[in-house]
């Protein structure tokens, strides 16, 4: 009987302390959304596959070209 009473008291104590900690932790996790959107221009020029092929062929490269991270590369 004595052990059951001690277990009941300890469970009640743990329940109360966990509820108190839960209320404190939810207040600190409120995140507010920023209203400003930041857009950055990519450092390298964009490349569209069909435009790259067409530009290279119009310059005289009969095999066209391909897109790389640095832009369009024409094939001989």
Curated annotation (Swiss-Prot):
Q: What induces it?
A: Induced by lipopolysaccharides (LSP). Induced by A.niger alpha-1,3-glucan.
- Has the keyword Signal been applied to this entry? yes
State the Gene Ontology BP annotations. defense response
Signal peptide residues are 1-19
Q: Taxonomically, which superkingdom?
A: Eukaryota
Keywords attached to this entry: Antimicrobial, Defensin, Signal
Q: Does the keyword Signal apply?
A: yes
Q: Which family does it belong to?
A: Belongs to the invertebrate defensin family.
Question: What is the recorded function of this protein according to its Swiss-Prot or TrEMBL entry?
Answer: Has antifungal activity against the entomopathogenic fungus M.nisopliae, but does not display any antifungal activity against S.cerevisiae nor any antimicrobial activity against M.luteus, B.subtilis, and E.coli.
- The name under which this protein is listed is Gallerimycin
Name the gene.
Answer: LOC113523440
